[in-house]
Amino acid sequence: MVSYVGSLNYGYNDKYYAGFSFRRDGSSRLAPDTRWGNFWAVSASWRLSQENFMKPWENVVSDMKLRASYGVNGNLPTGYYGYHGTYTTGAFYNGKPAPWEDAIANPDLTWEKNYALNLGVDLSLFRRVNLTFDWYTRTTKDLLMSKQLNSISGFGSIL
């Protein structure tokens, strides 16, 4: 596996923050046409407690920050040869070892992608009580899973 990684973070006036990260991964577990995957994330936050309209409540609300992030990451298949068929010689035909295909090729095998969204609030009250609220959702696309095949094919499943 080969990876290229980069990130960029920016803060302004101790109130506003933004971030971006990018990752490009390549793996020999996938076919040459689908070997490389691009994965990224963006984030932003706003410290409301630094705003002038929060000054009347600064003895109660010590710190308050709104956060949001969205991004995609990838997973690889667990096997090494999923994108091309494999053969074995565990059987005999007419008294001699005979090779037979034990796994079907899947040239379309690609990265499984997880898209995640996180929204949150960090809150500090009276400089003593810290609270964190998060809402999180994740959607998976191109799920890597074994699909059952008809037994007449001679194979049980394909990835």
Label each residue range with its predicted role.
Residues 1-159:
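Extracellular/periplasmic, surface-exposed regions of secreted and cell-surface proteins
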